[in-house]
Each structure stands twice: as C-alpha cells, then as structure tokens.
Amino acid sequence: MNTDAIESMVRDVLSRMNSLQGESATPVAASSSAHTAKVTDYPLANKHPEWVKTATNKTLDDFTLENVLSNKVTAQDMRITPETLRLQAEIAKDAGRDRLAMNFERAAELTAVPDDRILEIYNALRPYRSTKDELMAIADDLENRYQAKICAAFVREAAALYVERKKLKGDD
C-alpha cells in the first residue's frame, strides 16, 4: 500500500470521526463559534475543513501519515473539540434531528470532564451502584465544576427513575 493511499484512509477515518462522534436533554447556549452551520455544510471535514480543529489546535491538514509516524500527531491531538461538536449539533438541528443535536451538545459538555471522572460517573450510573444522594452530588458536580447542565439534568433524571424503579444502592 502506498503512502498516498494510507494518508487518504487516515483522512477518511478522521473525517468520519469528526462527523459521527457524539450521539446522546435541552441544548446549551448557542455555539460560541464564529460559524453558523447548516445541513448544507455537512460533512464539515469536506465542506469546511478550516472549521475543524482538534483540542490541541491541529487542523485536518496536520493529519498526515508522515506526521503520525514522526509523532507530530498524537492521540491527544485527535480529541474532538466542543466547538466542532456544537457545529455538528447545529447541522443536526437544521436537519430536523433535535434529539441528535442534543446528543452532540451533551458530548460537547463532556469534553471538559476528565476521562477518569467520566468512567466514575458511568459506573455510578449503573443500577444498584449509587444512592440518590450520590447521584445528585454527581449532577451538582457536573453542573457547577464543568458547567455541564445537560449532563447534570440527565443524571438527575436517572436518579428520579432509579427511585421510581427501585434501582438505587440497597434496593437489590
């Protein structure tokens, strides 16, 4: 396989990651991006690659096989930004896919939450793992520390459902 073919595959994978990542309650405030995305802007990687930046401010043009092999591009460079996710949310909303838009908004919020904390929250949300107070504390933490209002509402909703369905710690 030649370098051009591999580079093309890497670009395609990155393009798909940026256009598909983040599928999940009310959208957050309008995007702080300088762009307003419409369904005609999809896929961003093809139609507006200049709008797509990584968390380390790399552009799609930075993702070449040469840069990957020389460690100029790392796994950290591949993290999606909240701005890109919010642009995807705008596109979904423009396409009439409000639920998908909310999922992108929630994913945008989660970019501020450290991976270890996300795993802790995931485990805490499993049935019979947490008390209502513990879940409410998680919701407060998400809202106050990370400004993740959608995610906080999601955890509060889960807590209420767990009470109703007897899925809290000690209910089993």
Curated annotation (Swiss-Prot):
Pathway: Polyol metabolism; 1,2-propanediol degradation
EC numbers: 4.2.1.28
Any Gene Ontology biological process: propanediol catabolic process
Cofactor: adenosylcob(III)alamin
Catalytic activity, reaction form: propane-1,2-diol = propanal + H2O
EC category name: lyase
Main location class: other
Keyword entries, A-Z: Bacterial microcompartment, Cobalamin, Cobalt, Lyase
Pfam families: Dehydratase_SU
Superkingdom field: Bacteria
Record note on quaternary structure: The propanediol dehydratase enzyme is a heterotrimeric complex composed of a large (PduC), a medium (PduD) and a small (PduE) subunit.
Family from the record: Belongs to the diol/glycerol dehydratase small subunit family.
Name of protein: Propanediol dehydratase small subunit
Organism listed in the record: Citrobacter freundii
Lineage: Bacteria, Pseudomonadati, Pseudomonadota, Gammaproteobacteria, Enterobacterales
Record gene name: pduE
